[in-house]
Amino acid sequence: MKKLLFAIPLVVPFYSHSAETVESCLAKPHTENSFTNVWKDDKTLDRYANYEGCLWNATGVVVCTGDETQCYGTWVPIGLAIPENEGGGSEGGGSEGGGSEGGGTKPPEYGDTPIPGYTYINPLDGTYPPGTEQNPANPNPSLEESQPLNTFMFQNNRFRNRQGALTVYTGTVTQGTDPVKTYYQYTPVSSKAMYDAYWNGKFRDCAFHSGFNEDPFVCEYQGQSSDLPQPPVNAGGGSGGGSGGGSEGGGSEGGGSEGGGSEGGGSGGGSGSGDFDYEKMANANKGAMTENADENALQSDAKGKLDSVATDYGAAIDGFIGDVSGLANGNGATGDFAGSNSQMAQVGDGDNSPLMNNFRQYLPSLPQSVECRPFVFSAGKPYEFSIDCDKINLFRGVFAFLLYVATFMYVFSTFANILRNKES
């Protein structure tokens, strides 16, 4: 009896902390909060958590961490808390946990109707206003040599963010004749990029966009960056398992690293294997590094700079020629020669004295013709005599003719000797 009385204080607090009833739980207000130890129902995909003796269901925009055990959302009380071993299988353990095969459910992004518990934004629903980066009414498609890596599937369409716009895969295009090359065409559907939190090309629980005029539907990962890394290319499927493993063991779409159930306590470890496509990755890097390059703009910019340099050099040369011409013609020292004014002022007329004047003194004096005047000998003497101009002009004409003949003969004989020497 004493032992029983001693045990009563230990048993009463154990039951008193969970004195909630269904009515008291349902009367609790909704709360927007982040709960831990969250599990997901394998069939409805709803998320549940025990808190303060009540069972809560996550509604609205549900955002979870990478291991999906902590989620943020609008939590609604639906009844009394349930033991952890009776959960939906995500907590591992109980006999009613997730199956032992760990095959995983079909990724919801391939369906046309969103599955409850997931948040979607349809890239084709027309909620994207026109912008300046791209004009969806007059799209400018981009052609890729190979299917790019950074794409994601949604409602049977493949999308890609590129150059500040959301683009959608619209088929293949062939160009050329020898050889014929096939390109993958992506056409803009929005003037804004769509930022998505996904792994292995799949949406997880949150897709959001930003920068719109309307009130955007934005959600972020709590405790984890929304920019998740890309998995290896062509990763193989994981081999999930474990007796208490969650429903998302290996993943039917090649989850690779999520084997064994990321939400459960199962002991099975997933494994993924695949060949890394180096060529595809190289093409993706090439496209990422060159997608913003505008060849025409670069050529135009280079041509403009070269034309400017050529114009400056041409103007400098023209100015120098003008300065030299002015200095030679006595127009003053200007431009490049303006600094020599003080020195030139000490010579002649300074910079107003043509340079040619300084060279004329070194030129030989050539005879100049004058008006004919009679030659008078011994003027005023008894034996004075004179030669009239008509006789002088006659002599000049005869002498000039003889000089012409002699010059012609000299030139003719010179060329004749050259020709004779060439023939011999």
Curated annotation (Swiss-Prot):
Residues 19-85 are annotated as: N1. The keyword Ribonucleoprotein does not apply. Residues 132-147 have a biased composition (Polar residues). Pfam families: Phage_Coat_A. Residues 86-105, 235-273 have a biased composition (Gly residues). Its main location: virion. Residues 83-147, 222-279 are annotated as: Disordered. Residues 142-228 are annotated as: N2. One of its GO terms (cellular component) is viral capsid. It comes from the Viruses. It is found in: Virion; Host membrane. Residues 86-104 are annotated as: G1 (Gly-rich linker). One of its GO terms (biological process) is virion attachment to host cell pilus. The chain crosses the membrane at residues 398-418. Residues 236-274 are annotated as: G2 (Gly-rich linker). Residues 253-262 are annotated as: Not essential for gene 3 function. The keyword NAD does not apply. Residues 275-424 are annotated as: CT. Disulfide bonds join C25-C54, C64-C71, C206-C219. Consists of 3 domains (N1/D1, N2/D2, and CT) separated by glycine-rich repeats and a C-terminal transmembrane segment. The N2 domain interacts with the F pilus, whereas the N1 domain forms a complex with the C-terminal domain of TolA at later stages of the infection process. The C-terminal domain is required for release of viral particles from the host bacterial membrane and proper integration of G3P and G6P proteins in the virion. Belongs to the inovirus G3P protein family. Interacts with G6P; this interaction is required for proper integration of G3P and G6P into the virion. Interacts with G8P. Interacts with the tip of the host pilus. Interacts (via N-terminus) with host TolA. Interacts (via transmembrane domain) with host TolQ (via 2nd and 3rd transmembrane domains); this interaction allows the phage translocation across the host inner membrane. Interacts (via transmembrane domain) with host TolR (via transmembrane domain); this interaction allows the phage translocation across the host inner membrane. Plays essential roles both in the penetration of the viral genome into the bacterial host via pilus retraction and in the extrusion process. During the initial step of infection, G3P mediates adsorption of the phage to its primary receptor, the tip of host F-pilus. Attachment of the phage causes pilus retraction bringing the viral particle into close proximity of the host cell inner membrane. This is Attachment protein G3P. The lineage of its organism: Viruses, Monodnaviria, Loebvirae, Hofneiviricota, Faserviricetes.
